[in-house]
């Protein structure tokens, strides 16, 4: 699909369109499964992760929270919630410095989908919930 092509163009090693392929049934093994929409689960991803693989998702729900806590204690495969704001300040500073370097080198190209005025915040949120966004949705 269109988003799969976009993700591949951003440098992903392998992109799976969840509407066409059930990655959990794959015989391939992955170091990272990054679930951008939060439609999968660590339980589903576990079978395709390498021994030290990571399932990463920016959408925190009870299942991911439970799996993150459980896998922090046991096992090689890990479930992780990904949110920049939860990182240590020194890690955030290093990430921001790298981002500044990329911008200054003209190597940073954010993908912008739509911009909404603040008065249309509800519409912006509805659009994001469709799962069809192709980049950042900005509210100004």
Predicted regions: what is each one?
Residues 1-140:
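Terminal helix/beta-alpha structural elements that buttress the NAD(P)+-binding lobe
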């Amino acid at each position: 699909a269109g988003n799969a092509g976009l993700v591949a163009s951003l440098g992903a090693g392998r992109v799976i369109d969840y509407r066409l392929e059930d990655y959990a049934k794959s015989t391939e093994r992955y170091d990272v499964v990054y679930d951008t929409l939060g439609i999968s689960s660590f339980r589903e991803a576990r079978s395709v992760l390498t021994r030290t693989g990571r399932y990463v998702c920016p959408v925190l729900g009870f299942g991911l929270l439970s799996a993150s806590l459980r896998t922090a204690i046991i096992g090689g495969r890990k479930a992780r919630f990904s949110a920049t704001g939860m990182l240590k300040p020194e890690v955030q500073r290093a990430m921001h410095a790298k981002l500044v370097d990329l911008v200054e080198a003209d190597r940073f190209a954010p993908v912008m989908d739509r911009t909404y005025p603040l008065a249309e915040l509800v519409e912006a949120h509805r659009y994001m919930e469709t799962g069809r966004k192709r980049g950042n949705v900005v509210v100004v």
